[in-house]
Amino acid sequence: MALIVHLKTVSELRGRADRIAKVTFRGQSFYSRVLENCEDVADFDETFRWPVASSIDRNEVLEIQIFNYSKVFSNKLIGTFRMVLQKVVEENRVEVSDTLIDDNNAIIKTSLSMEVRYQAADGTVGPWDDGDFLGDESLQEEEKDSQETDGLLPGSRPSTRTPGEKSFRSKGKEKTKGGRDGEHKAGRSVFSAMKLGKTRSHKEEPQRQDEPAVLEMEDLDHLAIRLGDGLDPDSVSLASVTALTSNVSNKRSKPDIKMEPSAGRPMDYQVSITVIEARQLVGLNMDPVVCVEVGDDKKYTSMKESTNCPYYNEYFVFDFHVSPDVMFDKIIKISVIHSKNLLRSGTLVGSFKMDVGTVYSQPEHQFHHKWAILSDPDDISAGLKGYVKCDVAVVGKGDNIKTPHKANETDEDDIEGNLLLPEGVPPERQWARFYVKIYRAEGLPRMNTSLMANVKKAFIGENKDLVDPYVQVFFAGQKGKTSVQKSSYEPLWNEQVVFTDLFPPLCKRMKVQIRDSDKVNDVAIGTHFIDLRKISNDGDKGFLPTLGPAWVNMYGSTRNYTLLDEHQDLNEGLGEGVSFRARLMLGLAVEILDTSNPELTSSTEVQVEQATPVSESCTGRMEEFFLFGAFLEASMIDRKNGDKPVTFEVTIGNYGNEVDGTSRPQRPRPRKEPGDEEEVDLIQNSSDDEGDEAGDLASVSSTPPMRPQITDRNYFHLPYLERKPCIYIKSWWPDQRRRLYNANIMDHIADKLEEGLNDVQEMIKTEKSYPERRLRGVLEELSCGCHRFLSLSDKDQGHSSRTRLDRERLKSCMRELESMGQQAKSLRAQVKRHTVRDKLRLCQNFLQKLRFLADEPQHSIPDVFIWMMSNNKRIAYARVPSKDLLFSIVEEELGKDCAKVKTLFLKLPGKRGFGSAGWTVQAKLELYLWLGLSKQRKDFLCGLPCGFEEVKAAQGLGLHSFPPISLVYTKKQTFQLRAHMYQARSLFAADSTGLSDPFARVFFINQSQCTEVLNETLCPTWDQMLVFDNLELYGEAHELRDDPPIIVIEIYDQDSMGKADFMGRTFAKPLVKMADEAYCPPRFPPQLEYYQIYRGNATAGDLLAAFELLQIGPSGKADLPPINGPVDMDRGPIMPVPVGIRPVLSKYRVEVLFWGLRDLKRVNLAQVDRPRVDIECAGKGVQSSLIHNYKKNPNFNTLVKWFEVDLPENELLHPPLNIRVVDCRAFGRYTLVGSHAVSSLRRFIYRPPDRSAANWNTTGEVVVSMEPEVPVKKLETLVKLDATSDAVVKVDVAEDEKERKKKKKKGPSEEAEEEEPDESMLDWWSKYFASIDTMKEQLRQHETSGIDLEEKEEMDSTEGLKGPVKNKEKSRAAKEEKKKKNQNPGPGQGSEAPEKKKAKIDELKVYPKELESEFDNFEDWLHTFNLLRGKTGDDEDGSTEEERIVGRFKGSLCVYKVPLPEDVSREAGYDPTYGMFQGIPSNDPINVLVRIYVVRATDLHPADINGKADPYIAIKLGKTDIRDKENYISKQLNPVFGKSFDIEASFPMESMLTVAVYDWDLVGTDDLIGETKIDLENRFYSKHRATCGIAQTYSIHGYNIWRDPMKPSQILTRLCKEGKVDGPHFGPHGRVKVANRVFTGPSEIEDENGQRKPTDEHVALSALRHWEDIPRVGCRLVPEHVETRPLLNPDKPGIEQGRLELWVDMFPMDMPAPGTPLDISPRKPKKYELRVIVWNTDEVVLEDDDFFTGEKSSDIFVRGWLKGQQEDKQDTDVHYHSLTGEGNFNWRYLFPFDYLAAEEKIVMSKKESMFSWDETEYKIPARLTLQIWDADHFSADDFLGAIELDLNRFPRGAKTAKQCTMEMATGEVDVPLVSIFKQKRVKGWWPLLARNENDEFELTGKVEAELHLLTAEEAEKNPVGLARNEPDPLEKPNRPDTAFVWFLNPLKSIKYLICTRYKWLIIKIVLALLGLLMLALFLYSLPGYMVKKLLGA
């Protein structure tokens, strides 16, 4: 069978261009070759061939599209020709010449000529002549090429029901064939056949699934590839690139319908903010406080005095219990306030704000160590006000966030590279104005009682609208509101609310609310949220936020006014609105401000101004829309509503609302204007005889009242039978359909993509073959969909009512989809079997992006509401988006529910729908809806099931176009439904026993049936077939086959008293068999499938079932397939699931390891004493032995038992295994203690080992060089062994180890250079901090490699796409630049210029999580099953599974097919009594020494009012309870405990260790902050050997001493013995052989005296560290470690209360005793004394003006401190009246301090306030502050300048004052950095800086100082005096004696003034005068001398 198209020519083309044709049939497309430079005629002369597996339907369509081809841009569509293949099917050969149509369905001149041929399989169609085509050489070439195809693509198969063979443009003109004359009794109008988008009949689908697919070529220059008839896709040479586009898994049978509203339900949230420090605060000599606000809650840090860079490190926690929407809109505000105290509120320096949602959307829901930029909201021209470094995290219930490790944190001084901004936000944000323009509103509801209004009307005759509206806008923590419009349902404002904020803003949403002004309390009428991300685009070609002018629809509570509205929350925007409230016309614009403009208002206060009014037509031309609905079924009506008549009302906006839509605006129907383009486009859709005059067509919006009939004890139904009521509503809305059409196209693409991705996931989950092919098909469909969007979306470009957002958004969507299509195409080629999961993740990103783009921010037509009403009260509703119902003649634009029968489940409004009330179905409707323009009305019945007659409201001439008020079905089909209910698993526990008595109730149409009740199980196997006979369904048979009604299955718990409890619900669609179909594979019989059961929004188990709907033909039930039940069972009237559907069974053996029971709680107040465990699976089971005295020994005597059972061969269908624990009481009674259901046996199935695998091989050699000290960048060394490798592992001591040993012996100079630590100085903390450094380095490397990999993938997927990658490249370049800066930081960045070489220190492993998560819960052979009792709690109860746990069963399972492979039972030492559990240890009681090391806690939840806690450790194990109350740590949220505790315990009685952190309180009981529980028994018995961690190196002394009482060689010997492994065999030269693996390593060890001795321990340790490579028994051994465990509080389940770092060692008491515990007590800070001598100052700015002379001078003194101004501030004396800025002091400060070198922090203890009970320890950075001041006698001293020196890294001082420049402090020049802790003594000149009026640094002086650091001991030996005192006094400075007052010593002053100030001037004048005098004397004497000379005298 094949369809062949010969495309000849296309003529009358316009212009000269390259042409290409695309021919599509059944979604499979071929492209022609490109014809270059065609002018008028394109002569294609090409043949295309489709092999078809199923016969062609006469209604199928062939589509030809002609494009102008472009290599660069997307191809431009010239025109389309669509042909219905009716004539081709009848005559086999058709010649066609016809014109094309354009996008708007208008005829164009261009025409094509072609020939179409078809041969059916049975040869029924005409004579066939092969020669015409098959002789064609080109085709044979193509046939040949197709053998080498690298891809196959079946596309989607759109189809139509259009009779007639002409192209679609002739729609309105042509009558259908076959005797239909267009009368309505046939159930279809003439035009009904024109509906596109109705899915093609699936009758042939199974045959077609394997049909060869055709690839749509990426390179259009090539010929399209064709595949020959009957060729199996997998036989193609490159089958790996095959694509599959039809669904493999039967997902369509599982409609996903969630009943309960999820939005609006409150949840627990915790916002934690750590304020670390602030930098570069603007202002002089500040006392800053940081205020942290979240919503309305405020908290403050302590005040730091006289500093511009305060250090706080304070932690704040805010707890909330609100709905997610409210939470994410809360604003986090961080402000810095200067001089705040009890009396003063302080002045704001700057603030920073962002919403909680922005933080939550970050990776791990947090910002870590980021700098917030402060700006002044009162002065937007002021610029930057400083930075605050903080951590911000938002945690919801159940969120697990990974917090980076707190210890040993270095200052990240790269501020610019670590700003508190989301990815993509530029660091320099600009100020912008946000103009929210409010124009007018319509359709407001009544908001006052009419009582007073009626009184007024009676007295005054005044009739007012009962609402006084105004609009309030909330944005970024500010709000503004318009004026109030008194008494108006249609208020007109024309005002704009103006916000000023930084752009882009860090607040995502703007809230616009219409409120009613009231004297007592204003209430919200409706709320709309504007998401700024949806109305802007931040890309290169993006646009600023813009909106409208456009109408937005507001929804909320019902419109009837009551004084106390229970649904008022809905009007506030919380939860889904249940009714239309109003619509508001608004606009939004953003203007970026030029802050340098002097006319700019600098405040950010909200302003309200007048806005320019806009015309009414700006939102689009008003059009009349027509909504039609037909109610085909109303069932499952809740019994509460069953006693009164029920009616259904449909509304759109206020139209159709007859009960409370009183304030509906009466809009006149707009006149048609002759020039309208739309009119021309759609002229074919309207007809002349349409009854369109206003008033001709009244709306009918509700069904006639009808009394429900009973279905069963829970539900009723309405007996519609063959008469189906209809509704229709006329309404007027602006015509903005284009927006909805574009959204629909994207929704269609997204739905198709989601369906495909779900299918791929299902294939992976169920392990179906070739998921990669299906993913390729999904990507191919996505690519085609994106290209289709580009061709369809760009219509109506010149539409006058298009807003700027419409235009920009369309461009943006087109760019995104074009890029997505190309990425999908290139991704398709990369999909391989091993990359499926990675590519699936990338596709999920596509889906998210599509969903985001499809959400249209500018509304047009309001949503449709369907209300069920009883007794004139609204009971329940459903809401359908209008875009889903919108009609279009283009298939892709059609709403997904338009002209389709949709199943709707009505729900209760608002909060009534939460919880158990929301679980009940209020009503189930089968409803047909259609929405379109009135002029398209002829189509409204086109999708209804056929076979009806219309009943009109009125009869008369010309009324045939009126819609019907009901439909009477004359055609009906009779069916039988078979529901094969096999089993369910993981159901909710509905009884107090923790079990249920479940039965299932199946609903179909108006019938329901129940399965039998199975008692006391959560995993019932009903194995029952329910048969529903004589089901009457209305409509055509084939329509029912394609889209059968939904089956509802509800699971209930049978109660002896009262009604059954609801446990969950699921939905299914049956597989339909028509009477003329054979009941045979592949479709029948149906396969059992799992259906997810939901209770509300929570999953409540799975149902394994199958459903089939069988048509009963003319000969009755005789034609139905027989019911073949299993012959071996007789269950009376209950019919089991038939053979063929029920699973195929095999014999399995289930071995059970019974180890013991733990922590059993009392049952009915009585203790459990003699428990027993019952195991049951598929009706078979086994009982454990009885524990005779649970208190004495809770373990079982008999360890292993087994039973045999028949289980399905398909592992996915395995039934659950039930574990029950009963307590055996006297007189044969027993009570259920608790139960556990193992829902999946998969992990317990035994699979024989693969003998060919690598670790079974015993030959080969691998060399591994092991370094005892792991360098920073080296990750864990693993030995990989392949099947042919020799098994020798060489562990060499690395060369640098030997070098290190050598260097130790060298002199001190080399040692200093190498920075080699002195081993005697090292302790456990050195090891800990070194390990954390390594961990951080590894994480950093991991992140960078992760980023690189991600970017590589991005680059791969965007191959050849230059545009989309640009941003990425830019940001990457910036990151690289930053990285370089960080690696070579300047001096200002506070890091040493030469990179510090890491000292070599032995390390341990720091796990940032629990040890259990790293080692699979230590369940390698012993599993823990939680036993549950009691009812499953509901979400709103806040109850968790934890509360239902009544104990734990320890044991294991092993499931395998019998008989067992012989080689297993023949293995050495096989003990049949233990079965598969060979080599397990004895479970007799054992005494153990448990040693707990608690290192530290981080981020504890504050427990006191002051926001701090006083934590201490409490440990409980069995009866031992240790409370370390005396050693509580005062006011600390990050305490370092450094404690170890030894407890002797006895397993199994004492095996659960609880480590808790309590808050110490002086009065009252101590509060629990949080606790963590550790199961020690699983650790103790685990093969991972978690008793004592294996260290990295073996040492017998020093800080890294070996802790385990067993040496490595002893451990190795024991492991070999237990695992029955050959070895260990120690050989010479450090060799050891273990099971054909040889390890080599160092063979000597150095003792405390430096003596070297031979040892085997090093090599034994290397074998232990590679134990996972030992064949058969190898596994990873737990290394020496510290684990980080979350602390949880039972009162706040699911939210971490902090983290605790600890580790646990266990030592059996029958082994050698361990050594003394390690000393991990917190390091004591070392005492130092810093001596600072201030010698001189120079160039100090002169501040004072002299009273008499106006001379500038300063009275200088220098102030310095180390810990804080209040703690140790010291001042020099005053150098008075310095006229030059020079000051001489010779003054010494002494600063004693305690210092922690590892953390680089000064430790100080002080009382927090005068009321504090004890001192609090603070850790602050070691920074010396020097300030220069001008002393004043009467007023306050003036601050002149300061410098802050970080004692660990500060610029070296200049040698002279001249060389000292400002750049030394600002880091602009490269100055060497020094550390006082290394240099000990430093002297030099340093600059002092202050900020000027322009907020820039300026030099205000220089200080010469000398810093000398001594330890406390050295300081004691060499004491010195403070200031200039003894001992070792400093000389008095030689100051100029100008400290005077004029009138005391005038001569001295004159002398100073003249001598000092005018010295050089006076000298010059004197010299000049002397010169003049000499000249005068010379001139005076000259004549006399000359005369004398002349006369010779």
UniProtKB/Swiss-Prot annotation:
One GO cellular component term, please give it: basal part of cell
**Localization terms from the record:** Cytoplasmic vesicle, Secretory vesicle, Synaptic vesicle membrane; Basolateral cell membrane; Endoplasmic reticulum membrane; Golgi apparatus membrane
Q: In which tissues is it expressed?
A: Isoform 1 is expressed in the cochlea and brain. Expressed in cerebellum (Purkinje cells), hippocampus (granule cells of the dentate gyrus and in pyramidal cells of the CA1-CA3 region) and cortex (stellate and pyramidal cells). Expressed in hair cells of vestibular organs such as the saccule, utricle and crista ampullari. Expressed in the cochlear inner and outer cells (IHCs and OHCs) (at protein level).
Q: Which UniProt keywords apply?
A: Calcium, Cell membrane, Cell projection, Coiled coil, Cytoplasmic vesicle, Endoplasmic reticulum, Golgi apparatus, Hearing, Membrane, Metal-binding, Repeat, Signal-anchor, Synapse, Transmembrane, Transmembrane helix
Q: Which residues lie on this side of the membrane: Extracellular?
A: 1981-1993
The membrane topology noted for this protein in its Swiss-Prot or TrEMBL record is: Single-pass type II membrane protein
| TM helices/strands, residue ranges | 1960-1980
Provide the residue span(s) of the region labelled Disordered.
127-212, 654-708, 1294-1318, 1339-1398
Instruction: State where Ca(2+) 2 binds.
Output: 991, 1053, 1055, 1061
Residue spans making up a coiled coil are 807-836
Q: Where is the composition biased (Acidic residues)?
A: 129-145, 675-695, 1348-1357
* Bias (Basic and acidic residues): 163-186, 202-211, 1366-1379
- The record's free-text note on cofactor binding: Binds Ca(2+). The ions are bound to the C2 1 domain.
Q: Name the protein family.
A: Belongs to the ferlin family.
The record describes its quaternary structure and partners as: Interacts with SNAP25; the interaction is direct. Interacts with STX1; the interaction is direct. Interacts with RAB8B.
Q: What is the documented function of this protein?
A: Key calcium ion sensor involved in the Ca(2+)-triggered synaptic vesicle-plasma membrane fusion and in the control of neurotransmitter release at these output synapses. Interacts in a calcium-dependent manner to the presynaptic SNARE proteins at ribbon synapses of cochlear inner hair cells (IHCs) to trigger exocytosis of neurotransmitter. Also essential to synaptic exocytosis in immature outer hair cells (OHCs). May also play a role within the recycling of endosomes.
This chain's protein is named Otoferlin
What organism is recorded for this protein? Rattus norvegicus (Rat)
Taxonomic classification? Eukaryota, Metazoa, Chordata, Craniata, Vertebrata
